[in-house]
């Protein structure tokens, strides 16, 4: 059994790490290079770096920040935000990213995922799904784009399957209902997507304590768990998270 991964997430806008609730109300969490270095030292398995306003205001990705982060970090680095072309992916990989996350462009041009996968190999293509419940029972979820502002009408589980078929090597699944709330992952959503595909699924959105990370793996069937605010603001360290997962019988790299 593969070890489950713990992945701190750096949401970056205007060169600063920020954290909001339900994609709004952003709070400054610090300098991305300093934060990335700290997580590297704490033993994070990977880092995810999302330029959260790149798609919505059509800004080019801040390559100099990525280069500075990649220079300090010796664990796999996934970078996303405003990725719209093969040239964008090449620039990010050249700047030091190990994997590139495609979100809005996967919806507007699904064939782009296939082109990217054929060009660079599916091991470095992550498709990010921002999903939100569209029923009161929390049993159906749809994909939203542009930082959660645009509803697409696409069913999240079906979309994950399609992305796998087109060559995604990994799914980064964010529950927008839970993002920043600290109420825990949306476990029915996480489980439905994880069980529908046979590529790794990273659960994101809602972590408020270490038990939530455990639940994401045990109940959500996720291959990796991503968190931001519990790490950024010093509530827990990555090592504490790994110890909690290990105590719950989950294999992790210590």
Swiss-Prot record:
E.C. no: 4.3.2.10
Subcellular location as annotated: Cytoplasm
Main EC class the enzyme belongs to: lyase
GO BP annotations listed: L-histidine biosynthetic process
Primary localization class, coarse: cytoplasm
Keywords recorded for this protein, A-Z: Amino-acid biosynthesis, Cytoplasm, Histidine biosynthesis, Lyase
Pfam family, one: His_biosynth
Gene3D superfamilies hit by this protein: Aldolase class I
UniProt record similarity statement: Belongs to the HisA/HisF family.
Protein name: Imidazole glycerol phosphate synthase subunit HisF
Encoding gene (name): hisF
């Amino acid at each position: 059994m593969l070890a489950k991964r713990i992945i701190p997430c750096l949401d970056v806008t205007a060169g600063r790490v920020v954290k909001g609730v339900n994609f709004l109300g952003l709070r400054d969490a610090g300098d991305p290079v300093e934060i990335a270095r700290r997580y590297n030292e704490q033993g994070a398995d990977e880092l995810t770096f999302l330029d959260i306003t790149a798609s919505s205001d059509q800004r080019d990705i801040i390559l100099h920040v990525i280069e500075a982060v990649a220079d300090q970090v010796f664990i796999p680095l996934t970078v996303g935000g405003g990725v719209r072309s093969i040239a964008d992916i090449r620039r990010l990989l050249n700047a030091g990213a190990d994997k590139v996350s495609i979100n809005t462009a996967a919806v507007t041009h699904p064939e782009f995922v296939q082109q990217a996968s054929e060009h660079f190999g599916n091991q470095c293509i992550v498709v990010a799904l921002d999903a939100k419940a569209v029923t009161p029972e929390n049993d159906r979820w749809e994909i939203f784009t542009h930082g959660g502002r645009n509803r697409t009408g696409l069913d999240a589980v079906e979309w994950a399957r399609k992305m796998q078929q087109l060559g995604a090597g990994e799914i980064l699944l964010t529950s927008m209902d839970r993002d920043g709330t600290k109420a825990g992952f949306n476990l029915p959503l996480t489980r439905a997507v994880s069980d529908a595909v046979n590529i790794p699924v990273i659960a994101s959105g809602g972590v408020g304590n270490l038990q939530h990370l455990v639940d994401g793996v045990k109940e959500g069937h996720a291959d990796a768990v991503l968190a931001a605010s519990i790490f950024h603001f010093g509530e827990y360290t990555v090592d504490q998270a790994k110890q909690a997962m290990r105590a719950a019988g989950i294999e992790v790299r210590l």
